[in-house]
Amino acid sequence: EDEFVLSFHDINPQKKIHALIIPKGRYIDLDDFSQNASVNEIVGLIKGINIVAKKLGISADEGKGYRALSNISDHGGQEVPQLHFHLFGGEKVGKMVS
């Protein structure tokens, strides 16, 4: 947790490492966030994703890598009306869309 984001492990992990990263502002999805968040909030979220990846040992710097995913609206599979990113890693994550 920092000034801009809150992060925690998913209670129903889909991969070996599965964390959620949530901006502290109230934003419905990435569209809402990109249109209404401050520059500091946007930078804070992007940097927050990288910080969490490093803390979990899955950043590209460690030669591993990860997938950051955010579902947007009905066709994108969004179930919770709060912007959040899923961070998957610790193993190969497979194809982009099944």
Question: Where are the language model's segments positioned?
Answer:
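HIT superfamily nucleotide-processing domains
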Residues: 1-98
